[in-house]
Amino acid sequence: LILNFAESKLLPQGDVTIEINGDSEKNIITRPGSTLLSVLAGQSVFLPSACGGGGTCAMCECQVMEGGGEILPTETGHISRSKAKDSWRLACQVKIKDNMKIQVPDEIFSIQKWEATVESNNNVATFIKELVLNLPEGENLNFQAGGYIQIDIPEYHNLSFSDFEIENEYHPDWDQYKIWDLVANNDEPVFRAYSMANHPAEGNRVMLNVRIATPPPPLWNEAPPGLASSYIFNLKPGDKVTISGPYGEFFIKDTEREMVYIGGGAGMAPMRSHLFHLFQTLKTGRQVSFWYGARSVREMFYDEHFKEIEQKFPNFTYNVALSEPMEEDNWSGHTGFIHQVLHDEYLMNHEDPTEIEYYMCGPPPMINACDGMLDSLGVDKEMIAYDSFG
């Protein structure tokens, strides 16, 4: 009560105006007190925010020219001093108190929101589902390969993992680790970002690769399972899902350089998007190789699709390394971690690894290992593009 009283005295009692890009037609009239990110979203101005407004992804940057107050400690770890001097802020951390003037990229106004329908939601690996969503009839998601969408996660309670539809071939690990026993709860609506696996020619639908997020078994009583992935794993054909997009910056560079793609786990999504666009649409003549790390044969997906591309295009090679192949896999290919296999089998003998463009998406340990390996070869950071996730 004391805090509410103090806030009521500190904030203006009337409406405030947010001027966007100096265009009075885009003005937003709102009550003070909310974050800039949430107010903009409420007016269909969808800044990207992979963390759902938690201040950790630093993707909701915009310029607050007037009325934003001083930059906060929660922002300075993400915004450089030079950018801060140019009035860059994190919209999720800026509380609306006074009239404001802000600048956002023009492409933000092309972002839309839809109610999509689940077409299918099948496992492609033990802990990864391929979620396919259809947009409303006549709608099209005009995006670049490597883009992502944000999906709204509603409030839900007592969502039981035992209700998930998991194909029988993946049951052994779910049984062994008793994953069926988990229950998820979400106390308030949030949103999360997922890279699209579909490419622009498939623009009337959205395909995601989503890995279920669970804590290690010893922490099940202390740490909850992932809010978004639990919700997504429970979706059934015909269900309605709210998404917004397109967003993104993990795009194909318009050069003639050689390209090396490195992926692991659900990091497959933007790899598929890029590679299908490069070869099915652009029919590129660039030299391209794809290096994917999986645990075992059961965790390999879209395998036949990439083999087909390899057969049709002599300028493409597809390489897989298994870190823990099973006896029944009868695996005769590469083993070990993908960064080491890429180094030993290709880059170590390449005439100039520093002239290659690298595109990476996968779990942080894989990204970190690849970074170290490429740094040891003298590859400049500007030659590396990331779609990193936690």
Which role fits each region the language model picked out?
Residues 2-5, 9, 77-134, 139, ...:
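Fe-S ferredoxin-like electron-transfer domains
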Residues 2-53, 64-83, 284-390:
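Reductase modules of NAD(P)H-dependent flavoproteins
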Residues 48-58, 91-93:
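Cysteine-centered iron-sulfur cluster-binding motifs in ferredoxin-type domains/subunits
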Residues 59, 101, 148, 237-240:
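Residue-level marker of beta-strand positions
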Residues 107-116, 185-192, 300, 332:
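Short coil-to-beta-strand transition motifs
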Residues 117-237, 295, 321-325:
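Ferredoxin-reductase
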Residues 231, 244-257:
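A short, basic/flexible loop-to-alpha-helix module at the beginning of a structural domain
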